[in-house]
């Protein structure tokens, strides 16, 4: 079992229940999924860039990403409907907790000039979204083998009903907020 999942079940659940004043154990907020998204806008002109993004995402997430397609043609961005423009991965269960553990303990400390995540990035329903500017903060990525620096969006979906519950959940996991 993942280290973070064991810690959540054994100590963090009770701490959250007491902190939020919840009586029913099924109401305690938990993380349901983590979605990683990498938009590769330049893939419209160079298809090889998307292959590199898919390879990086597969190393980071531990599972094969799905290629996302443009929903409509936009002349200003020089893309057509149905063209591949990015990739995404949805992590659940054990892989989700393993990724979250690596993110909190290894990747976040390696971010340059990091002062904490914004606590305003909650969506109003307890879900948190953040962006990373470079994929090289993850130890799985070999700096010498990447073709270019790419960023990614990370969305953490929770069962929390409010932003305060979501913020409390993320703080107990060890997320550094400003």
Curated annotation (Swiss-Prot):
Its keywords, alphabetically, are: Ribonucleoprotein, Ribosomal protein, RNA-binding, rRNA-binding, tRNA-binding
**GO MF:** rRNA binding; structural constituent of ribosome; tRNA binding
Example GO BP = translation
Q: Which SUPFAM superfamilies match?
A: RL5-like
Q: Which InterPro entries match?
A: Ribosomal_uL5, Ribosomal_uL5_bac-type, Ribosomal_uL5_C, Ribosomal_uL5_CS, Ribosomal_uL5_dom_sf, Ribosomal_uL5_N
Q: Does the keyword Metal-binding apply?
A: no
Q: Record's Gene Ontology CC terms?
A: ribonucleoprotein complex; ribosome
Write down the superkingdom of origin. Bacteria
The record's section on NCBIfam families has:
PRK00010.1
- Function of this protein? This is one of the proteins that bind and probably mediate the attachment of the 5S RNA into the large ribosomal subunit, where it forms part of the central protuberance. In the 70S ribosome it contacts protein S13 of the 30S subunit (bridge B1b), connecting the 2 subunits; this bridge is implicated in subunit movement. Contacts the P site tRNA; the 5S rRNA and some of its associated proteins might help stabilize positioning of ribosome-bound tRNAs.
Q: Which family does it belong to?
A: Belongs to the universal ribosomal protein uL5 family.
Subunit record text: Part of the 50S ribosomal subunit; part of the 5S rRNA/L5/L18/L25 subcomplex. Contacts the 5S rRNA and the P site tRNA. Forms a bridge to the 30S subunit in the 70S ribosome.
User: Could you identify this protein by its name?
Assistant: Large ribosomal subunit protein uL5
Gene source species: Acinetobacter baylyi (strain ATCC 33305 / BD413 / ADP1)
Its ancestry begins with: Bacteria, Pseudomonadati, Pseudomonadota, Gammaproteobacteria, Moraxellales
């Amino acid at each position: 079992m993942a280290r973070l999942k064991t810690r959540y079940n054994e100590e963090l659940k009770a701490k959250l229940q007491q902190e939020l004043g919840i009586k029913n154990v099924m109401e305690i907020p938990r993380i349901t999924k983590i979605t990683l998204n990498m938009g590769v806008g330049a893939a419209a002109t160079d298809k090889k860039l998307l292959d590199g993004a898919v390879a990086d995402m597969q190393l980071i997430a531990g599972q094969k990403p799905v290629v996302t397609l443009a929903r409509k043609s936009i002349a200003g961005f020089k893309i057509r409907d149905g063209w591949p423009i990015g990739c995404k991965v949805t992590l659940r269960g054990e892989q989700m907790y393993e990724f979250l553990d690596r993110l909190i303990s290894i990747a976040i400390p390696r971010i340059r000039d990091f002062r904490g995540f914004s606590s305003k990035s909650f969506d109003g329903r307890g879900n948190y979204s953040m962006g990373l500017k470079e994929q090289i903060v993850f130890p799985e990525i070999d700096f010498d083998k990447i073709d270019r620096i790419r960023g990614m969006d990370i969305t953490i979906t929770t069962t929390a009903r409010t932003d305060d519950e979501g913020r409390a959940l993320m703080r107990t996991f060890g997320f550094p907020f400003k």
